[in-house]
């Protein structure tokens, strides 16, 4: 699904490149430093989602010339994170800790003792617990140093390429960059990328030896779970919104424009949907999907394929049942717009209702659609 969204984004960029009007609008967007910072972060999360969407099953053995694959499927993100993706503890632990958060009971010399248990992947390389502070400081300093060096290299190369493309000297380009005289504030992108690089190097220096953000109740690494949740959040948010918009826009505008029995019918429909408890509906739908998966075990061989199907159907269900709020807002705005003079003039000139809704109503409710879509 993430790959499909990425392909759709690519086609949209090609469409923007061919349209002067869209290019002018996007030039206005990228002239803001805050917009470019947000765009850089979105690209980073999209990259994480794409890397986490490429799944494969490694070959564990070869018998009679046939490859035997592992039952468990992995993603490129799992392989990139390496040890962090497989390290599991028993329960909670603090960030960068070397022992569990809670004491456990064990026997020493035949006597019961309650003490903290050492973590499997948290400071296991340390010879003594007293070396923890020094080790963390050294690894953090090395990570920060590497991050700052890479950030400086990024700034140097980027400024050099920009100055060469514009025919200016390096010093002049640096002066222009810091005085913010360019139409596109490249310093916003470079600053955001530098922060990500420094944080990445810092985490990369500590993560092979510690749980950077600790572990949860079941002993899983919290930072690893956060990285893995990016793809889920992107798929659910984007797919549910894309599923919601057609129903909400069409039905909401039609209810406000036609009024009468059309309005009553659409109101009855979304009032009925709103009365159904969403949690129970989602739970029932997931159970139905699970029954389908159990009835067709050959179609989904691995656990990750079954999880992806459940995630996809869950997003569709949320989208199909979550359009009522936006439809109400669009209905109310359309009721107001339909009484304005330019709508009456369009009717007087013989323009059909659907053309009026497309040309005159929809452009005036786009702001509501954008706000609700972003908040959802």
Indicate where each model-derived feature is located.
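Alpha-helical transmembrane segments of integral membrane proteins
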Residues: 34, 158-159, 189-199, 215-376
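Gly/Trp-centered helix-boundary motif
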Residues: 1-244
């Amino acid at each position: 699904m993430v790959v499909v969204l990425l392909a759709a984004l690519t086609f949209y960029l090609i469409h923007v490149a061919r349209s002067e009007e869209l290019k002018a609008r996007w030039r206005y967007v990228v002239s803001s430093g805050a917009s470019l910072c947000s765009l850089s972060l979105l690209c980073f999360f999209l990259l994480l989602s794409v890397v986490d969407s490429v799944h494969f099953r490694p070959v564990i053995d070869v018998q009679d010339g046939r490859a035997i694959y592992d039952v468990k499927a992995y993603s490129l993100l799992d392989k990139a994170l390496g040890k962090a993706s497989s390290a599991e503890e028993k329960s909670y632990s603090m960030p960068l800790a070397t022992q569990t958060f809670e004491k456990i009971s064990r026997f020493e010399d035949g006597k019961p003792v309650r003490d903290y248990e050492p973590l499997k992947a948290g400071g296991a390389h340390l010879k003594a617990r007293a070396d923890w502070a020094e080790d963390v400081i050294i690894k953090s300093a090395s990570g920060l140093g590497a991050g700052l060096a890479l950030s400086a290299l990024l700034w140097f190369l980027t400024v050099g390429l920009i100055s060469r493309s514009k025919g200016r000297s390096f010093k002049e380009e640096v002066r222009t960059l810091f005085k913010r005289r360019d139409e596109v504030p490249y310093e916003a992108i470079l600053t955001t990328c530098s922060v990500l690089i420094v944080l990445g190097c810092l985490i990369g220096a500590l993560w092979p030896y510690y749980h950077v953000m600790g572990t949860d109740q079941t002993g899983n690494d919290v930072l690893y779970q956060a990285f893995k949740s990016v793809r889920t959040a992107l798929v659910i948010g984007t797919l549910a919104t894309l599923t919601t918009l057609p129903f909400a826009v069409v039905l909401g505008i039609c209810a406000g424009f036609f009024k009468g029995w059309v309005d009553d019918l659409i109101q009855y429909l979304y009032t009925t949907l709103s009365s159904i408890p969403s949690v129970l509906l989602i739970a029932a739908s997931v159970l139905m999907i699970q029954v389908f998966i159990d009835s067709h075990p050959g179609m989904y061989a691995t656990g990750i394929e079954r999880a992806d199907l459940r995630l996809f159907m869950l997003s569709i269900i949320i989208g199909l049942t979550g359009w009522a709020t936006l439809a109400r807002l669009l209905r109310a705005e359309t009721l107001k717009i339909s009484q304005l003079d330019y709508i009456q003039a369009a009717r007087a000139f013989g323009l059909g209702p659907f053309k009026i809704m497309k040309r005159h109503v929809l452009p005036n409710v786009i702001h509501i659609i954008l706000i609700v879509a972003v908040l959802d």
